[in-house]
């Protein structure tokens, strides 16, 4: 790996470290209870917000990949980071809104969070594989490693981030806002360091988005991989 790409790789992995928190927070019982109390709904209703993450991901998947190939890994990752910041800070705003539309705001923000997930996947996975081209398998395993570390630390972070509002309600807004701010910082940093695909694009003309979509072909093996991906993340 070229050492000049080391900061870029770290930025990519940090995106997924915070993603490990963002994709897990709505599954935490204490956060479900806090959000349900703020919005005046049953804790089970928070499951619909979690499902909106999947909906947003499905919405973005058909075009996130071609856009990443056309515009570059940097732009795709930047879209993902910015969208994730909107999702997390939006959750804090939704909590503060309470029963005055808070649940609906959270649902929309969760869809945006799902969209950001697709753009992070299509930007960061190929980016780290291109950076660590001699061991792309290790590069993608690093993504799972950072997610796992974040999820392992999340219970401890919840104990630190919890606060109480003026009305006596339990709030995890510091966690939402803090992670959102980190994503905003990562959004800026992604433009400051080099990526291999940016230099390659400077030396040649890439295929257009429409042409790329026309050449898309799903083989039996690719469909099988999609099914495996769906079931393994669903469990």
Each predicted region: which residue ranges?
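Pair of pore-lining "gating" transmembrane helices in MFS-fold secondary transporters
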Residues: 2-28, 217-234
């Amino acid at each position: 790996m070229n050492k000049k790409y080391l900061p870029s790789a770290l930025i990519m992995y940090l995106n997924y470290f915070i993603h490990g928190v963002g994709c897990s927070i709505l599954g935490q019982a204490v956060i479900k209870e806090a959000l349900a109390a703020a919005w005046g709904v049953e804790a089970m209703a928070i499951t619909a917000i979690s499902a909106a993450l999947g909906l947003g991901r499905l919405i973005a998947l058909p075009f996130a990949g071609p856009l990443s190939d056309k515009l570059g890994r940097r732009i795709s990752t930047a879209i993902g980071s910015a969208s994730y910041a909107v999702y997390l800070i939006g959750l804090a705003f939704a909590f503060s809104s309470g029963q005055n539309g808070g649940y609906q705001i959270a649902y929309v923000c969760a869809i945006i969070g799902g969209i950001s997930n697709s753009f992070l996947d299509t930007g960061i996975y190929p980016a780290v594989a291109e950076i660590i081209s001699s061991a792309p398998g290790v590069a993608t395993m690093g993504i799972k490693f950072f997610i796992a570390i974040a999820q392992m630390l999340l219970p401890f972070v919840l104990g630190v981030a919890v606060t109480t509002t003026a009305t006596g309600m339990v709030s995890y807004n510091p966690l939402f806002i803090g992670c959102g701010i980190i994503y905003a910082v990562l959004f800026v940093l992604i433009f400051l360091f080099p990526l291999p695909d940016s230099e390659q694009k400077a030396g040649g003309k890439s295929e257009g988005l429409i042409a790329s979509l026309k050449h898309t072909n799903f083989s039996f093996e690719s469909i099988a991989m999609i099914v495996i991906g769906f079931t393994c993340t669903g469990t």
